[in-house]
Design a protein with these regions (language model features):
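Glycan-recognition and catalytic cores of secretory/periplasmic carbohydrate-active enzymes
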Residues: 1-174
Length: 174
């Protein structure tokens, strides 16, 4: 992050794209993750985390998982992008929204550290049964990248601790 923090520019090529990502892409992607855009297929990404948290907390789900087996990675990539944006342009509102998503992710984590909404909500009996196509490692890797970026840019380590729990789970499993 020091390299990003030390990177200075004013306008030009990089300035244009940094502003576009900060002002358009990150807010739009957040609205997509929250299913707030009419006329397009719903992402259900954050809703899947809500369902997983509900299942962890109550043992039941009031809805169904929707999306691809790798749906969680969309949330991870948004958090990572937001973290890099926060590093260059502190934004209290964006940081608070990220913190809220991180709280939800923590609630969706199983007691043994496992974190993947597809398997928690839809088919827990199939965890780790298809390493090639199951995308558990893929989603974990993206969320670990987000956790590191968020800790580096904000100094907050909650997501990092959550993902250390998942890394410990993977280590014990394999």
């Amino acid at each position: 992050m020091e390299l990003i923090r030390n990177f200075k520019y004013s306008g030009g090529f990089f300035g244009h794209y940094e502003e576009l990502i900060r002002d358009v892409v990150i807010p739009y992607q957040e609205r997509i993750l929250n299913d707030e855009i009419d006329g397009i297929e719903k992402s259900h990404s954050l809703e899947n985390y809500r369902l997983a948290a509900e299942k962890i907390e109550t043992g039941k789900c009031s809805g169904k998982f929707y999306g691809m087996v790798f749906q969680d990675s969309d949330v991870a990539k948004w958090l990572e992008g937001a973290a890099y944006s926060l590093c260059l342009n502190p934004d209290k509102s964006l940081e608070e929204r990220c913190d809220s998503v991180i709280d939800l992710i923590g609630r969706a984590q199983e007691a043994d550290g496992y974190l993947d909404t597809y398997y928690t909500v839809l088919c827990p009996e199939k965890k780790w049964t298809n390493l090639e196509q199951g995308h558990e490692m893929y989603c974990a890797g993206h969320m670990i990248e987000a956790a590191v970026a968020y800790a580096e840019s904000t100094g907050k380590e909650k997501l990092l601790h959550i993902m250390c729990g998942m890394a410990d789970h993977i280590y014990k499993r394999f």
